[in-house]
Design a protein with these regions (language model features):
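Phosphate-coordination/substrate-recognition cap region in phosphate-metabolizing enzymes
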Residues: 155, 163-164, 169, 176-200, ...
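NTP-dependent small-molecule kinase module
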Residues: 4, 12, 29-33, 169-172, ...
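Conserved substrate/cofactor phosphate-moiety recognition/catalytic segment
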Residues: 54-121, 133-137, 141, 146, ...
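Extreme N-terminal, non-catalytic leader segments
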Residues: 1-42, 66-70, 271-272
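Hydrophobic anchor at the beta1->P-loop junction of P-loop NTPases
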Residues: 45, 153, 435
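The conserved Walker
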Residues: 49
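Phosphate-binding P-loop
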Residues: 33-39, 143-146, 426-428
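A glycine- and Lys/Arg-enriched "phosphate-lid" helix/loop adjacent to the NTP-binding pocket
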Residues: 91-101, 132-136, 170-230
Length: 499
């Protein structure tokens, strides 16, 4: 009989340290669970160039796809412009006083809008709704039958006229429209975004001369400033959110509902400041040596050796910047014995920061939401024992590891639900973060940031004794793997079968 948070399998000879039952997942974390199955959403980006709009758009789609199971897509007007006029459009192409170029850019926006509508309403009944000749009664018809569809209309959309056109295009359709404006007055952030455009923007990647590309971008920006109109009370009938200076201030207007509220929370935590995440599994545990899954066993001597190596690495590389000087850094782990023991040698010196007070370096934050996937009645068993005792369960898991749930245990989808709030917090951090975790949990966090579909996460490699460094960027994610201790196939450190 289960008591409190203890495992339903009581301690016994084969499983002396069972894993505790993990915290309950948030059942409302997935689209379609609590929301209207026919709801669709459009998020319209607003703002000057170099304000992080495309970064926000891509991150938003990634978040909704991975954590909420939504079919979400970015419709970038710049892509359609490059298809029409090429990627060498001169700065004066964006001159608001040039009627011909204004018309061309509007045509690009119309093409993006048309494709977004097709994506959102791709069944025949909905296609009739978006037909230009459909009568107004049909515009008030029932919502579509497809759940979790999100379109992100990514462009400057920086005039009231353009936003009125977007509103008119979507008026009467069964879709919620929310405008998202990014405002930044921080010159250092703007300058960094301009310089990043040389390496990440498809408009400038081919330009060999960096200063020439930056000058061209600045001239383009000047043209946009001439016509820029921020969201204001004149558009109070619209639903919108303003993010000012990387989330320092948030202004919300007519935002209602579960998903819009969730998105506002996500956007409020997001910023474009570059930082790195470091992921590592715990050191070798006693159950690793015995080939058992789950449990809550302690480290072996080899595991403690890795913990010492990790502490040295953290001090030299995570807690110091490129110049070798101390920098603020964070540390998370699960609540399980093996991760807490892996963190035990990491130092926590105090940093006196001008204007910020005292910072405790690598202050250890422990989260049960980072605990390993719970194997239920199979906790503490080897895979051979599971296959022998529960052959049908073993076969089901092999067919679909993402959705398979152990009897009285968890699935990868359950872990996704409990990781959602932690990723929200990770997005808000400006400092490097080290997470000491477990294979299944780190597979999911890694997959999210590295850009893998969640269906592929259960097969990704997260080896022992290895640090994975990820540095997310607008169009990519840089990855580096550092092996701190060689894995000896003969001493119990062999990679166990996949959890």
């Amino acid at each position: 009989m289960m008591s409190g948070a203890r495992s339903p399998t009581a301690p016994h000879a084969n499983n002396p340290t069972p894993q505790a039952v993990p915290p309950p997942e948030q059942s409302d974390s997935f689209l379609g669970v609590t929301g209207n199955a026919g709801e669709k959403h459009v998020f319209v980006m607003v703002g000057l160039p170099a304000r992080g709009k495309t970064h926000m758009a891509r991150k938003l789609v990634r978040y909704l796809s991975f954590f909420h199971g939504a079919d979400a897509r970015v419709f970038n007007v710049g892509y359609y412009r490059r298809q029409r006029v090429g990627r060498d459009a001169p700065p004066d192409f964006f001159d608001p006083g040039n009627a011909a170029n204004v018309a061309t850019r509007q045509a690009c926006a119309e093409e993006a809008m048309k494709e977004m509508k097709t994506f959102l309403f791709h069944d025949r009944a909905q296609q009739a709704i978006i037909d230009q000749d459909a009568d107004q009664d049909r515009l008030k018809g029932p919502k579509g039958v497809y759940s979790g569809l999100v379109g992100v209309f990514d462009a400057t959309n920086s005039t009231r006229e353009r936003r009125a056109w977007i509103s008119q295009e979507l008026a009467g359709l069964p879709v919620k429209v929310i405008f998202v404006e990014s405002i930044c007055t921080l010159e250092d952030v703007i300058e960094q975004n301009i310089r990043d455009a040389k390496t990440v923007s498809p408009d400038y990647q081919h330009v060999q001369n960096t200063e020439e590309a930056i000058l061209s971008f600045r001239r383009r920006l000047d043209f946009y400033k001439q016509a820029y109109e921020t969201l204001s009370e004149e558009e109070s009938h619209l639903s919108w959110v303003k993010l000012i200076n990387c989330g320092q201030k948030l202004v919300i207007n007519r935002i209602h509902g579960f998903l819009p509220g969730r998105i506002v929370q996500f956007l409020a935590n997001m910023h474009a400041t570059q930082r790195s995440f470091y992921f590592t599994r715990h050191g070798q545990s006693q159950y690793n040596v015995r080939g058992k899954i789950g449990g809550d066993s302690a480290l072996t001597e080899a595991g403690k050796a890795y913990a010492r190596k990790l502490a040295e690495f953290a001090d030299m590389h995570i807690c110091r910047g490129d110049d070798g000087e101390p920098q603020k850094a964070r540390l998370w782990s699960s609540s399980m014995v093996r991760t807490r023991e892996t963190a035990q040698f990491i130092a926590h010196p105090k940093l006196a920061l001008e204007g910020e007070g005292v910072w405790t370096q690598m202050s250890h934050r422990i989260y049960r939401n980072l605990d390993e996937l719970y194997a239920g009645v199979c906790d503490g068993m080897t895979y051979e024992e599971i296959e022998e005792a529960f052959p049908d369960e073993f076969a089901r898991r092999k067919r679909d590891k993402l959705r398979y749930r152990y009897p009285r245990g968890e699935s990868y989808l359950d872990i996704i639900a409990r990781l959602d709030p932690l990723v929200m917090e990770m997005e808000s951090y400006h400092e490097p973060l080290l997470i000491i975790g477990h294979q299944a949990v780190l597979r999911l966090i890694y997959a999210y940031y590295a850009g893998y579909p969640r269906e592929e996460a259960p097969q990704l490699s997260i080896p022992l004794n290895t640090i994975i460094k990820l540095t997310p960027k607008t169009y990519s994610c840089e990855e580096e793997r550092i092996c701190l201790l060689e894995i000896n196939q003969e001493d119990g450190q062999r990679e166990p079968p996949s959890h």
